[in-house]
Amino acid sequence: MILTVTLNPAIDVSYPLDELKCDTVNRVVDVTKTPGDKGLNVCRVLNDFGETVKATGCIGGESGDFIINHLPDSILSRFYKISGDTRTCIAILHEGNQTEILEKGPLLSVEEIDGFTHHFKYLLNDVDVVTLSGSLPAGMPDDYYQKLIGIANLNGKKTVLDCSGNALEAVLKGDSKPTVIKPNLEELSQLLGKEMTKDFEALKEVLQDELFEGIEWIIVSLGADGVFAKHNDTFYNVDIPKIEIVSAVGSGDSTVAGIASGLANDEDDRALLTKANVLGMLNAQEKTTGHVNMANYDKLYQSIKVKEV
């Protein structure tokens, strides 16, 4: 069983446009609305892949009800109700670009935060892996992911963390370490205070920084160029083929789903990295965020090259 945690979920609205025109009216014909934010994308892909998954997070208002009502029935919904309204996030797809407008979301009270913490502990009983994805809602301290990871570690659960900014820094500087982190180059550059490129030797050097000590897996997304990964003391480069991209929204979350599945099934390094990248690519071939077409899985799986470097 895999538990996905989405503390600041959203309704994701996608507007495809041939051209985005500023300071005038843009009319959209094809609008897609889905339960969104990173963790909900993760749980949907895990469900498509056939994993047993339950989803939790903080939801409220009619938007929160929309999320529960529009998740597949095969996903176990174990959300914690709050008084504020769940947010809406808009992605405008135009001219090969993606422009996002993201609401901040509700403000949580101390009582609601404590309530979710107890709720989280209860959900761990039958879980092997926990994914923690996305931003923290207003009111939650920067070290809240650190707190949840500590609880999961005490209960013997593997954790996959996909966040950025102060929340990620708090985890890296804290005592409780996740099993996996998945920064991209931009997030890695922010953490280290210097611009990082796809230079493998430079990546090998920085991933051995004491900042990352105690983290079993560091999987750095290189976008269309695949992944650079560190597992304990071993480094890998993952080459992926060129594909036709319909929408890249949620592809990183699909990669997290593959990582979690690999951990839950005790797969070896190459199998885990291959699965993670295939799921990320499959999502990019779909219009719907957080969805994969398993009919294409085997063909893409055979095209991935994982090399120790």
From Swiss-Prot:
Record-linked CDD domains: FruK_PfkB_like
Enzyme superclass (EC): transferase
Top-rank lineage group of the source organism: Bacteria
Gene Ontology cellular component annotations, sorted alphabetically: cytosol
Stored InterPro entries: LacC, PfkB_dom, Ribokinase-like, Tagatose/fructose_Pkinase
Database matches in HAMAP family: LacC
Gene: lacC
Protein name: Tagatose-6-phosphate kinase
Pathway participation: Carbohydrate metabolism; D-tagatose 6-phosphate degradation; D-glyceraldehyde 3-phosphate and glycerone phosphate from D-tagatose 6-phosphate: step 1/2
Gene3D superfamilies for the chain: 3.40.1190.20
Statement: the UniProt record of this protein carries the keyword Translocase: no
EC number: 2.7.1.144
Keywords assigned: ATP-binding, Kinase, Lactose metabolism, Nucleotide-binding, Transferase
Reactions catalysed, as given in the entry: D-tagatofuranose 6-phosphate + ATP = D-tagatofuranose 1,6-bisphosphate + ADP + H(+)
ATP-binding listed as a keyword: yes
Source organism: Streptococcus pyogenes serotype M4 (strain MGAS10750)
NCBIfam families linked: 1-PFK, lacC, PRK13508.1
